[in-house]
Swiss-Prot record:
Chain positions found as Glycine radical: G102
Protein name: Autonomous glycyl radical cofactor
Domain of life: Bacteria
Species name: Serratia proteamaculans (strain 568)
UniProt cross-references to HAMAP family, sorted A to Z: GrcA (MF_00806)
Pfam family, one: Gly_radical
SUPFAM superfamilies per record: PFL-like glycyl radical enzymes
Family matches, as PANTHER family: FORMATE ACETYLTRANSFERASE, FORMATE ACETYLTRANSFERASE 1
Single annotated GO MF: formate C-acetyltransferase activity
Biological function: Acts as a radical domain for damaged PFL and possibly other radical proteins.
GO CC terms, sorted: cytosol
Database matches in NCBIfam families: spare_glycyl (TIGR04365)
Glycine radical domain boundaries: 5-127
Keyword terms of this UniProt record: Organic radical
């Protein structure tokens, strides 16, 4: 069982007011935050903390991760005419964002050559 604690008294003053997660089954403690000597997420044997007094901190446990499968699809929905107009009148489309090789980019930030390339690759007559 995992218990959240705040150390209230310890021989090592760097531990006072630090927060930990205690794993009773493994006899380990995971540092949530401490003033010094311990890094966030560092796991140590409980015995390494020495003589301590603590108060329990309520933990909000979330259910385990449920994997349902599925896929992710990213679609650009626009017309060729919109991109061509954005080339001619960039001031009309300051927020026009497109996907290029998996990255989001402002269409107006592309060079004219890159803009033509995007239009050519995005809108084809046949597969």
């Amino acid at each position: 069982m995992i218990t959240g604690i705040q150390i209230t008294k310890a021989n090592d003053q760097a531990l006072v007011n630090s927060f930990w997660l205690l794993d009773d089954e493994k006899s380990e403690a995971r540092c949530v935050c401490a003033k010094a000597n311990y890094a966030e997420d560092q796991v140590v044997p409980v015995s390494e903390l020495g003589q301590i007094e603590y108060r329990e901190v309520p933990l909000e446990m979330q259910s385990t991760v449920r994997v349902e499968g599925g896929q992710h699809l990213n679609v650009n929905v626009l017309r060729r005419e919109t991109l061509e107009d954005a080339v001619k009148h960039p001031e009309k489309y300051p927020q026009l964002t497109i996907r290029v090789s998996g990255y989001a980019v402002r269409f107006n930030s592309l060079t004219p050559e890159q803009q033509r390339d995007v239009i050519t690759r995005t809108f084809t007559e046949s597969l």
